[in-house]
Design a protein with these regions (language model features):
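Long, basic/Gly/Ser/Thr-rich N-terminal segments
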Residues: 1-126, 295-358
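Structural motif
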Residues: 5, 68-72, 152, 227-229, ...
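ATP-dependent carboxylate-amine ligase catalytic core
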Residues: 22, 26, 36-60, 172-251, ...
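Conserved Switch II/interswitch segment of TRAFAC-class P-loop GTPases
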Residues: 73-81, 235-240, 259-275
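Short, conserved loop/helix-junction motifs that constitute active-site signature segments
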Residues: 89-95, 253-259, 284-288
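Flexible, glycine/proline-enriched loop segments at strand-loop-helix junctions
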Residues: 101-102, 153-161, 202-206
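N-terminal pre-Walker A segment at the start of P-loop NTPase domains
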Residues: 118-140
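Walker A (P-loop) phosphate-binding motif
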Residues: 136-184, 276
Length: 358
């Protein structure tokens, strides 16, 4: 087993530690004191499920006690936290550690790190998602067809439970003996032995459908899956005037490149089921595929956020929902029974039937 340390640890790595393969044993989760990204630091994980780990702000102790160091994906625009991550990377290199680096670095910086690893006896693996714009495209083929069912995971708001739903469903389906092709723009997908694809990285909007289609097709040829599950990178619809995201443009492009057979909608906590029915009906038309159900977690918009874009968790035991209402299938993200019911629904409706035969 590999003893690993994750630095810097933020909300974005929460699902990573829950689903890491058994060969990894976490020894340290390092989070800096007084440095963070609003809405992403560990304070917003209050009322999350217990994970059984303690946080530390000591880079030295955390890295010393681990065999493998995971340096997380921090955007360069988050200057202080990025510098913290880079300093942790340099320390790990000088201690001769094995490093899995998700930190965005340019080619010159990567070369410097490689040479330092040679000097200090360590090794650094730089992780980058697949980019459709870099796939060798077959000019003779416009679009490939997919002969297995395709399911989308869509969200009401960015990072409101879609990635957790994706991995839970994928793991459950895999345990049932099926082979899923799991696609997300989350770079940590690679650590979980799935695939990461940067849907935003296309040469142009007019080429985006073909480029994404061919990138996913090449992955499907490699994996030979029973089902394709795609985590849509942006919400299909704007949340409000302040949070428009991309107004569903990228999700529409993906739906044209990899046509879906059904979608799961991940919602913020709400009891307004009429609103959910209206919005899911609209998304159904935008994605051109039926709703499988609504996955409701315990997150709401943080009323104390200065940016108005952060989420906060409510106590999970406050979630009280009906499983069926207004012709919607509702699934509680914290209910094992509901999760099993959702997976059974997907298997019965998409995998147990002879696909494409009526």
């Amino acid at each position: 087993m590999k003893k690993i340390c994750i630095v810097p640890f933020t909300k974005n790595e929460y699902s990573l530690i829950e689903f890491l393969p058994p060969e990894y044993v976490i020894t340290s989760l390092i989070t800096p004191m007084g440095i963070g990204i609003e809405g992403q630091d560990i304070s917003v994980m209050r009322n999350s499920s217990d994970i059984g780990y303690q946080f530390t702000n000591s880079i030295t102790n955390g890295i010393n006690n681990a065999d493998t160091i995971i340096v997380t994906n921090i955007e360069i625009t988050e200057k202080k936290l990025y510098e913290y991550a880079f300093q942790a990377l340099l320390m790990a290199v000088k201690l001769g550690k094995d490093i899995i680096c998700f930190l965005p670095l340019n080619d010159d910086e990567k070369e410097v790190i490689r040479k330092m690893c040679e000097c200090f006896g360590g090794m650094c693996q730089f992780i980058k998602p697949l980019t459709p714009s870099h796939v060798d495209k077959d000019a003779k083929v416009q679009l490939y067809n997919f002969h297995v069912p395709v399911i989308y995971i869509s969200e009401m708001y960015t990072n409101c439970g879609g990635y957790e739903a994706l991995i839970r469903i994928a793991e459950a389906i895999r345990c049932k003996g099926y082979k899923p092709l799991v696609l997300s723009n989350n770079p940590y997908n690679i650590l979980l032995k799935y695939h990461s694809i940067n849907f935003n990285d296309v040469t142009s909007l007019e080429n985006s459908v073909v480029e994404i289609n061919q990138a996913v097709y090449l992955l499907s040829c490699k994996v030979n899956p029973d089902i394709i599950i795609v985590h849509l990178p942006n919400p299909v619809m704007q949340y409000n005037r302040q949070n428009r995201f991309d107004c569903g443009v990228l999700s529409h492009v993906i739906s044209q490149a990899v046509p879906g057979n059904g979608y799961l909608y991940c919602s913020l906590k709400t009891k307004d089921f009429r609103f959910l029915k209206a919005i899911t009906d609209t998304i159904e038309k935008k994605l051109d595929c039926p709703l499988i159900g609504v996955w409701i977690g315990n997150q709401i918009l943080d009323p104390a956020s200065s940016s108005g874009t952060s989420l906060v968790n409510l106590p999970a035991d406050n979630i009280s929902i009906q499983s069926q209402t207004d012709s919607l299938s509702i699934y509680n993200a914290f209910s094992i029974i509901d999760q099993n019911s959702l997976v059974s629904c997907i298997i019965d409706n998409f995998l147990n039937l002879s696909y494409g035969v009526i």
